[in-house]
């Protein structure tokens, strides 16, 4: 088991698109939290990949994607079957967020594990239309070797120390994410 190392990690945001988000349980909550995480990661100069599955049919990502992020339109369910592998390839660790847990997220995680990556699935930043699908997907991904984490685990592991220059902004993000969760519960 490993702790997230920001120098060896990339973050993958899967298919948070206009026609999909409203159909998924807690889709708007997940998208809102992902939007804030992505903005913070952009300030951290993190390796970020955003995928859109059949964008012509499902629409674009529901929030602004920073120019520094790699944006990939895909048709395969697995996000690494297409161009996003270019950014992910040099990174040993991949943090995964997105939709749907049992479809594109699941197949991506399985392919990442097969490629010998350390995979961290952010349980409060993945979603499916039916909660049973999310639950089953998380169980299978964990059994296959993925580490199931929360957004707070990701952030505190990313920073690791109160003396880190990004600690203050990370703590503000944690507080904001807690407010968002409380408002939507």
Which sequence ranges carry the predicted segments?
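Active-site loop/turn elements of alpha/beta-hydrolase fold enzymes
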Residues: 16, 53, 124
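Short connector loops/turns at beta-strand edges and beta->alpha or beta->beta junctions
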Residues: 16-19, 115
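A positional/architectural concept
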Residues: 19-24, 28-50, 55-66, 71
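Active-site-adjacent betaalpha module
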Residues: 2-10, 43-44, 56-185
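N-terminal nucleotide-binding beta1-loop-alpha1 segment
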Residues: 10-16
């Amino acid at each position: 088991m490993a702790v997230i190392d920001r120098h060896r990690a990339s973050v993958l945001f899967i298919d948070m698109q206009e026609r999909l988000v409203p159909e998924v349980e807690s889709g708007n909550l997940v998208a809102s939290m992902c939007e804030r995480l992505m903005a913070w990661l952009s300030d951290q100069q993190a390796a970020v990949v955003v995928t859109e599955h059949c964008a012509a049919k499902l629409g674009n990502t529901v929030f602004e994607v920073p120019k520094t992020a790699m944006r990939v339109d895909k048709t395969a369910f697995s996000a690494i079957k297409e161009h996003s592998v270019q950014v992910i390839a040099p990174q040993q660790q991949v943090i995964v967020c997105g939709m749907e847990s049992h479809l594109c997220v699941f197949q991506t995680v399985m392919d990442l594990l097969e490629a010998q990556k350390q995979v961290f699935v952010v349980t409060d930043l993945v979603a499916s239309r039916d909660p049973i699908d999310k639950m089953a997907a998380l169980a299978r991904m964990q059994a296959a070797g993925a580490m199931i984490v929360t957004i707070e685990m990701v952030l505190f592991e990313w920073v690791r120390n109160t003396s880190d220059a990004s600690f203050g902004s990370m703590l503000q993000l944690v507080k904001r994410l807690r407010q968002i969760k409380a408002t939507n519960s």
